[in-house]
């Protein structure tokens, strides 16, 4: 049987390739970790060539596991870690420097300088983003300023810039395609998300030559054909989007007002705002959720730095649990009369506070506080932080009503206790899907729908399956008291008034 779909999920610490059949079932999986480089404090780099090798390797593993050949693959979809910045020689295809990862903070001073020049409102108006080292633009400017001769080569069109998706497409097509999609472009700090174009004014401010930029396409489009020298046949690449955006798609959040939240080490929540490009007054990001058939759908995005990492802290630093899976059962044993708050500002606080200097703290300790209370506080901190995001989104956009249903994915959502507490604090239903790998599923759908093998948006939404819906059950007075305690705790950790 042909008609298989290959989805490549290139993440921050590992690469996965997953094969789906016509019925959207997983039939093959390859996964491989790669090296993290930390050349200086706050710097994070990846070897783009190592990432490319991991993609080739995991594709071959997935094909072997499925027992099929590349000739049986109808289309490829790609999803990727966003913002990570690669520059390579247009002819040789060799990177000029290691990739600068989204986590890298080396351009913090440059961002501060741009803020002092009062340029952040301009960037936000055009890109929906904040002036932060997180995004690609200042990383690319750093490379142009620090790699000898790079600026001159860029001006002559001799080098290419791209996010990871663009780099992989270039390599997969044997150097024939230098392209990206609208979602990845929207994370660069140089793309006008209202006019869907690279912005000359922002390029000029950052000193970036337009000649090095990729062509921007819809998320489901013809991105090129794989070089037959790689797998013996040419396979069309038909779907591309950043990882948080494919999670929106994989959760079938196609209607305005639908919201997804991915819980891993951190948390990323995106609220579909339809064709409304909402400007946040709460320092949330405005981003492109997806662009299909030339129509741009926008989202409000909020990021939480510490979610599952709080549980890892209980295990690794505190020694309260041996394995992460123990935490829910331990939290259930906590004394209900104790209300302990953990503000996990281990690396500052993200949206909507954006306080990089805030530090973590624990409030409400008594002589009877033990491991169980710490476990409950760690899990509850995820719910409270999600509440902060939802409240900010509801303040920014009238479509984010109190009737919002949150669809969740990621490692933490396997815990029934955590999901129930999330529903209680949000006072909103929480839906957990049957298939939790929504990021890679979204990439597969983009390619498969373009190929005409999987159903369209309506059909895909109808096939989305819910494993469990968690309905809010906490009495309102108890909920209000709990949230008031959280707000008080956070206020004590902030370094500047909100």
UniProtKB/Swiss-Prot annotation:
GO molecular function (one): glycerol kinase activity
Ligand binding (ADP): 12, 16, 265, 308, 411
Binding site for ATP: 12-14, 265, 308, 312, 411
Source organism superkingdom: Bacteria
Keywords, ordered alphabetically: ATP-binding, Glycerol metabolism, Kinase, Nucleotide-binding, Transferase
Keyword flag Nucleotide-binding: yes
Notes on activation and inhibition: Inhibited by fructose 1,6-bisphosphate (FBP).
Catalysed reactions, semicolon-separated: glycerol + ATP = sn-glycerol 3-phosphate + ADP + H(+)
One GO CC term, this protein: cytosol
Pathway: Polyol metabolism; glycerol degradation via glycerol kinase pathway; sn-glycerol 3-phosphate from glycerol: step 1/1
Protein name in the entry: Glycerol kinase
InterPro entries hit by this protein: ATPase_NBD, Carb_kinase_FGGY, Carb_kinase_FGGY_CS, FGGY_C, FGGY_N, Glycerol_kin
Organism field: Brucella suis biovar 1 (strain 1330)
Gene designation per UniProt: glpK
Family: Belongs to the FGGY kinase family.
